[in-house]
């Protein structure tokens, strides 16, 4: 069995024996929607809120996410409710942009072999000391 190393998340003062829960909508659709969710997350005593800013779809006419506008919405709500923010990065061209707005960058399982993306996330987070969440499975 592999050894699991647990480290505290900076700036939150969390103990290493606590479970960190990330809650939020699949997609940031509006400032009102995200702020309502942020208020609920804060009321629950959680520290992190997540939301999708970029939502690539196979149908080019489907909602693709709000992009940078979603990142601005997330930052504003995070600041208002004292929450850390997290979103998935799927394109290496977005690494710096995402890092400029959120506290944590998420990499989904489908991008574990996307070495350009992983390299760029490494470069950006080495400079900014942002957290990276590697999400496998559900």
Enumerate the predicted regions with their spans.
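Structural preference for beta-strand elements that scaffold enzyme active sites
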Residues: 20-22, 47-48, 82-86, 104, ...
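Active-site mouth loops of central-metabolism enzymes
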Residues: 19-36, 59-65, 83-88, 108-110
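Glycine-enriched alpha-helix->loop->beta-strand junction motifs that scaffold or abut catalytic
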Residues: 45, 97-107, 123-132
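Conserved, mostly hydrophobic/aromatic
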Residues: 24, 41, 49, 98, ...
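Glycine-rich, proline-tolerant flexible connector loops at the mouths of alpha/beta enzymes
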Residues: 50-69
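Conserved anion-binding
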Residues: 57, 111-138
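Alpha-helix-loop-beta-strand connector modules within alpha/beta enzyme cores
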Residues: 63-87, 121-131
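N-terminal amphipathic alpha-helix/helix-capping segment at the start of soluble metabolic enzymes
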Residues: 1-22
């Amino acid at each position: 069995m592999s050894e699991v190393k647990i480290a505290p998340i900076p700036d939150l003062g969390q103990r290493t024996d606590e479970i960190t829960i990330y809650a939020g909508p699949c997609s940031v659709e509006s400032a009102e929607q995200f702020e309502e969710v942020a208020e609920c997350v804060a009321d629950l005593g959680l520290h992190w809120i997540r939301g999708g800013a970029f939502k690539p779809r196979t149908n080019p006419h489907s909602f693709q996410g709000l992009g940078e506008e979603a990142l601005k919405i997330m930052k504003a709500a995070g600041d208002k409710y004292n929450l850390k923010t997290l979103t998935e990065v799927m394109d290496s061209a977005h690494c710096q942009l995402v890092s400029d707005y959120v506290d944590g960058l998420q990499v989904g399982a489908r991008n574990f072999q996307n070495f350009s993306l992983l390299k760029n996330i490494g470069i950006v987070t080495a400079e900014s000391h942002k957290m990276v969440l590697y999400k496998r499975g559900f």
